[in-house]
Amino acid sequence: MVWKRLGALVMFPLQMIYLVVKAAVGLVLPAKLRDLSRENVLITGGGRGIGRQLAREFAERGARKIVLWGRTEKCLKETTEEIRQMGTECHYFICDVGNREEVYQTAKAVREKVGDITILVNNAAVVHGKSLMDSDDDALLKSQHINTLGQFWTTKAFLPRMLELQNGHIVCLNSVLALSAIPGAIDYCTSKASAFAFMESLTLGLLDCPGVSATTVLPFHTSTEMFQGMRVRFPNLFPPLKPETVARRTVEAVQLNQALLLLPWTMHALVILKSILPQAALEEIHKFSGTYTCMNTFKGRT
């Protein structure tokens, strides 16, 4: 027993070195991308913004079928028609992911009409863009139901079949605000932090589940209607990401079976700074960059 423990202590650092070297090599040498031709993809919030771009990207990369969920039928119809014109089978369903029973009922309808979902992209989200004391209680609940609990319900609806098939992928379109919150978006930041913890736990829980993986994407501010009006102090230094960039990198992460994706790569510095700098220094960074007041001009989706 003692020798086994000593052996484990010796092997563990060697294993860590091997994994670090392997990851470094992967950054230099192109890896083989996963074939999507047999995959059925479901995207929540798929009618517009990043969701629409994700549908385009999956279609361009050969996904077999694409299913869109959302609450606005006009947007869902437009995106569905566009994907069909690209030559990919596409369907849409009206579904509020914040409503548990509606999620389960719609998931059943999807299985009956389309078949098994093998890639689930949890993209649906809302933001009210207010401080705690200025926020309506119902609005706060809505954010948590859609942004966080909605992922519980969709994952519970589709993961069991993925485990049976030993083929599946759960994707969470999160936000860098899950790691570094800002004033004026307390509902959104809280829900995204919760969703990040959810995915971190889920990813670890899938380690012994062959063929089923998870990916969490943490993008910086993206130029969509959702955060319309948001302004940082130095827009040339901190330009918003394009939705098509986020979509392309997200699908690539799925094909590479990448567990965590921070966009842009400079956001890795944020993780390091938060772990070593004192709170006072972090507060000065918020003030200097303009994230302290960036929601003052927030308008949101109109």
Curated annotation (Swiss-Prot):
The active site is at Y188. Substrate binds at S175. Induction: By retinoic acid. It is found in: Membrane. It is a multi-pass membrane protein. The chain crosses the membrane at residues 9-29, 170-190, 195-215, 253-273. Gene3D superfamilies: NAD(P)-binding Rossmann-like Domain. Widely expressed with highest levels found in heart, placenta, lung, liver, kidney, pancreas, thyroid, testis, stomach, trachea and spinal cord. Lower levels found in skeletal muscle, intestine and lymph node. No expression detected in brain. In the retina, expressed in cone but not rod outer segments. It holds the Pfam family adh_short. GO terms for molecular function: all-trans-retinol dehydrogenase (NAD+) activity; all-trans-retinol dehydrogenase (NADP+) activity; electron transfer activity; nucleotide binding. Keywords: Lipid metabolism, Membrane, NADP, Oxidoreductase, Transmembrane, Transmembrane helix. SMART domains: PKS_KR. Its EC number is 1.1.1.300. Catalyzes the reduction of all-trans-retinal to all-trans-retinol in the presence of NADPH. Belongs to the short-chain dehydrogenases/reductases (SDR) family. This is Short-chain dehydrogenase/reductase 3. The lineage of its organism: Eukaryota, Metazoa, Chordata, Craniata, Vertebrata.
